[in-house]
Amino acid sequence: MTIVNLAAYHFVSLDTNEQWRPLVTARCNELGLRGTILLAPEGINLFIAGTREAADAFIAYLRHDPLFEGKFATLQFKESLSDSQPFRRMLVRLKREIITMKKPAIKPELGRAPFVDAQTLKTWLDRGHDDTGRPVVMLDTRNAFEVDVGTFDDALDYRIDKFSEFPEVIDANRADLEGKTVVSFCTGGIRCEKAAIHMKEIGIENVYQLEGGILKYFEEVGGAHYHGDCFVFDYRTALNPQLQPTENVTCFACRAVVTPEAQQSPSFVPGQSCPACAPAASAA
């Protein structure tokens, strides 16, 4: 059976999440869906999977059910297909933030951050500057281990271990961004959108988010100005610029990405260890 995987997020002010939670949970269970839906005062973030019919019914439910008062009417979903159900159960969780930055929740009613689409960004990178002549700086908002799998050429990478470190590293490296056009990017858009909003709020000018993240860029223009693959948080581990799964795998023990080369190491034992964690395991 073919399973449809849905991913979506939307920054929008929500104040009835506690009432929604049991109703959304019940509807997902009725449809046989599995995955996780996060509800927070700043919006919604979801990763769910089910049959084609269930996925279509859920999309219609969020967009059109009077319960949601039109707040998700424009919600855009990313879809992918798999041969099996990637999730074990269905969870609807209430959170303080839909992506943790440990800063006061953003104010969605003030509008989303400015964005640049993939084709425009490629044009800027082709010529080395934006439409006004300012140099373009690509700012990677992902964790260091994700960046190591692949990133844009000459991107700024501050080697963060978690997204909540982002505000601190931006404060410390603000001079890198002054006088330039800054394009924040991430896998699918949620982190780079919140990062761009934060930078705007602290007074950094000429900040954009990459619309749809790296995966949308791959879909529209391929791998131009990008080297490597894109790490994804599911069973595929990484996708190449053609959006095909690669031979990278995730270590069961430490969650590190193991490249095909590293898989040749004696330290790589599927389900047990990899070159990143084997020394620590043997020392213990």
Swiss-Prot record:
E.C. no: 1.14.-.-
Q: Does the keyword Oxidoreductase apply?
A: yes
The record's keywords, sorted A to Z, are: Oxidoreductase, tRNA processing
- Domain of life, per lineage: Bacteria
Q: Which PROSITE patterns match?
A: RHODANESE_3
On whether Transmembrane is a keyword of this UniProt record, the answer is no
Q: Which SMART domains match?
A: RHOD
Q: Which reaction does it catalyse?
A: uridine(34) in tRNA + AH2 + O2 = 5-hydroxyuridine(34) in tRNA + A + H2O
Q: Which residues form the active site?
A: C186 (cysteine persulfide intermediate)
What NCBIfam families does the database record attribute to this sequence?
A: PRK05320.1
Function, please?
A: Catalyzes oxygen-dependent 5-hydroxyuridine (ho5U) modification at position 34 in tRNAs.
**The protein's name:** tRNA uridine(34) hydroxylase
Query: What organism does the UniProt record list as the source?
Result: Burkholderia lata (strain ATCC 17760 / DSM 23089 / LMG 22485 / NCIMB 9086 / R18194 / 383)
Gene that codes for this?
trhO
